Amino acid sequence: MYAVIRTGGKQYKVSQGDVLRVETVAGDAGGEVIFDDVLMVGGDEGLKVGEATEGAKVTGTIIRQMRDKKVIVFKKKRRKNYIRTQGHRQNLTVVRISGIS
């Protein structure tokens, strides 16, 4: 059985036992998280999309909170002595999917 969930403005295809890196979800390591925004559920019984997925939930366990690799933002205007460098590290949560219902 698999499902498509939406979290952090992105969509993920998940099945039981998968490990995902998603945008920050509040909680501590070992805590449980519930994804209510299920877009599609598929399996042996067939495919459910849209209103048929109301009431579907995907549960997972938070493995750890982490930060992604640094992305460097570099701006320059030629001949004007203007250079700006800025770094950004996105906060992520590593989640193991424990069930789809």
Curated annotation (Swiss-Prot):
Part of the 50S ribosomal subunit. Contacts protein L20. It comes from the Bacteria. One of its GO terms (cellular component) is ribonucleoprotein complex. Pfam families: Ribosomal_L21p. PANTHER family: 50S RIBOSOMAL PROTEIN L21 (PTHR21349), LARGE RIBOSOMAL SUBUNIT PROTEIN BL21M (PTHR21349:SF0). Belongs to the bacterial ribosomal protein bL21 family. This is Large ribosomal subunit protein bL21. One of its GO terms (molecular function) is rRNA binding. Keywords: Ribonucleoprotein, Ribosomal protein, RNA-binding, rRNA-binding. This protein binds to 23S rRNA in the presence of protein L20. One of its GO terms (biological process) is translation. HAMAP family: Ribosomal_bL21. The lineage of its organism: Bacteria, Pseudomonadati, Pseudomonadota, Alphaproteobacteria, Magnetococcales. The keyword Signal does not apply. InterPro entries: bL21-like, bL21-like_sf, Ribosomal_bL21, Ribosomal_bL21_CS.
